[in-house]
From Swiss-Prot:
Family as reported in the entry's similarity comment: Belongs to the bacterial ribosomal protein bL20 family.
Chain's role: Binds directly to 23S ribosomal RNA and is necessary for the in vitro assembly process of the 50S ribosomal subunit. It is not involved in the protein synthesizing functions of that subunit.
UniProt protein name: Large ribosomal subunit protein bL20
Encoding gene (name): rplT
GO BP terms, alphabetized: ribosomal large subunit assembly; translation
Length: 119
């Protein structure tokens, strides 16, 4: 049985990694060893930050809701509790959008929440 060298397999594997490393600075897009390390690190960052993005957006929504709620004389937590007691199920993403783009509608929700808290 003749000896089979892995040249084609290795070249394919290297090409695949170097293709993923396109656009990286310096040797990180030229040399396989440093490109491979950087691609692995980049994939880890991408995986981590897909989860981080969800947390970041939730924090942003809460900040926007809180700012508008305080203009209506409520804290964020009291507003959310008031809405829950009133049976209004609006998620934070929609509330934040209302707080930025439709202040009148947000103010209506805030007055409803305030009245349910006082009642």
């Amino acid at each position: 049985m003749p000896r089979v060298k892995g040249g084609i397999v290795t070249r394919r594997r290297h090409k695949k990694i170097l293709k993923l490393a396109k656009g990286y600075f310096g040797s990180k897009h030229r040399l396989f060893k440093s490109a491979n390390a950087q691609v692995m690190k980049s994939l880890l960052y991408a995986y981590r930050d897909r989860r981080q993005k969800k947390r970041d957006f939730r924090k942003l929504w809460i900040t926007r809701i809180n700012a508008q709620a305080r203009m209506n004389g409520l804290s964020y937590s009291r507003l959310m509790h008031g809405l829950k007691v009133a049976g209004i199920e609006v998620n934070r993403k929609m509330l934040a959008d209302l707080a930025v783009n439709d202040k009148a509608a947000f103010n209506e929700l805030a007055t409803v929440a305030k009245s349910k808290l006082n009642a």
